[in-house]
Amino acid sequence: MKINLLKNAHAAIAALFITMFAMPTTMQAQTSYELEIADTKVTSANCDDLSVINGVSGTVKYDPVAKVLTLQDAIINIEDGHGIYSEVKGLIIKLIGTNKLTAKKAAIGFREALTITGGGTLYAESLSDCAFYAIETDLIIDNCVVNAKSKLYGISGNSSTSEKLIINHATVTAEGTERGSIRDFAAFTLIGCNITQPAGAAFDPAKRCVALNGEMVKSKVVITKDPTAIETPIADNRVAQGIYTLSGVRLSGELKDLPKGIYIVNGKKVVKP
């Protein structure tokens, strides 16, 4: 019996040392990305299944190499904070099925160019801020359905000096009942779609908003896809240049100087023997 106890004690001590040494390694290996879902940081540990975050359900996942956030029949509901906040350069939100974001602050706020695409539908509502908030950057809505609603701002830029809004073959509604439905953009481009509500509304470059009879529109703006329009793909210059690990960490130097392994080189997977 004593021998067995001694063996068990030795095994327990060995397991403790292994755990102590393994924990820092695990912690160091985790990578954080410039992306938050329901005010929770996206990392290499949770990016494959972001439905583990409180207030998130459905399929929500992030590919750090392709910089694609996939929403598939997803619901993101946060009582105090942002639904999605991004500082990822060239982030793509891919919509599959019907998705709903509800947040007290911005439903989607971003400081780097954002493209929303995928063919699905998104309902984005802010209870006390912007449904979409482009902070000194551009927003592209491409071949999908987007509905933005807030009692304050619908789809909004920040300074209105540099932000650009492009809607390409998409159906969009925007409503900001107190401060404007689509506003604070330096430029607004419609490709293969038109403003159909309110009748006669258009982007006013001087006021930098969608206006009607010289006044900013605060009721629902409806942009309808033209079924007869020829599809116009938007050039994609977002492929990450350089060498990255599979977890999305950028590496310095040249491939020839790196150890054996699998890397992402200029957006393509490369195996170094």
Which ranges hold each PLM region?
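Bacterial N-terminal signal peptides that target proteins for export
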Residues: 2-14, 25
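Generic low-complexity segments that are intrinsically disordered, proline-rich and/or Lys/Arg-biased
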Residues: 11, 25, 29-31, 199, ...
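Generic structural signal for beta-strand residues in well-ordered domains
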Residues: 22, 62, 86, 109, ...
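A composition-driven surface/loop motif
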Residues: 29-226
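C-terminal outer-membrane/trafficking sorting elements
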Residues: 228-273
